[in-house]
Structure formats: C-alpha cells, structure tokens
C-alpha cells in the first residue's frame, strides 16, 4: 500500500478511507479535504431511491467546509470518486486519488 509522503496528505487519505466505511446504504465513496487553515472535513456518499436526495462524498465534504466558512483548499483525497466536482473550487489544488485499500493511484492538480 503506497501512502503520500506528506503526513498531512496521508491524514486526509485516512480520513477519506474511514468516511467511506460510513456510506449509506453501503460503502461507496469517501472524501476528505484540508482547507487553507489546516482544518479537515470528511464525508461519505449517501444514496437514496430518489437521486435528488442522494449526495456524493465530495459534495458532502465540500458542503461541510463551505458552510463552515472555508473558501480555499490545500488538498483533497478521494476514495472511489472522480475529481470532476473539484474544477470550480479547487483550481491549483493537489488531489489524491486512492483505492478503497488506501493505495494512492494518482496525485494531480486540478
């Protein structure tokens, strides 16, 4: 299992992996992010039979961060998700893509 060299990046990968296990109705995806003050936010995906009531892990983590006042981000970690939703809020921010076992498969800047 590879891990990010930066301990703070490793922390958000771990947070995303842990959040993924709390997904509903089943583990699907987890996300975590770190804002420019060092605060971290994590969320799991939440499914529902009505797609309008479902949310992705990334949306949940971003909603928690933005509703707490965060507007700038240092890094994102995604487990079983894609970085498409990051385009607006994360320009120039590193994204750590990880498999469910925590293997970081890509590091990119959106």
Question: For the regions a protein language model found, what residue spans apply to each?
Answer:
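C-terminal binding/interaction regions
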Residues: 1-26, 63, 68-110
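Conserved mixed alpha/beta catalytic, RNA-binding, or beta-rich assembly cores of soluble enzyme
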Residues: 15-68
């Amino acid at each position: 299992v590879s891990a990010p060299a930066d301990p703070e990046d490793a922390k958000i990968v771990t947070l995303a992996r842990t959040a993924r296990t709390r997904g509903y109705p089943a583990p699907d995806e987890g996300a975590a992010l770190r804002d420019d003050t060092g605060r971290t936010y994590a969320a799991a995906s939440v499914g529902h039979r009505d797609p309008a009531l479902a949310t992705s892990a990334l949306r949940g983590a971003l909603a928690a961060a933005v509703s707490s006042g965060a507007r700038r981000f240092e890094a994102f970690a995604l487990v079983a998700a894609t970085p498409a939703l990051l385009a607006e809020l994360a320009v120039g921010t590193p994204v750590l893509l990880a498999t469910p076992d925590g293997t970081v498969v890509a590091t990119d800047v959106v």
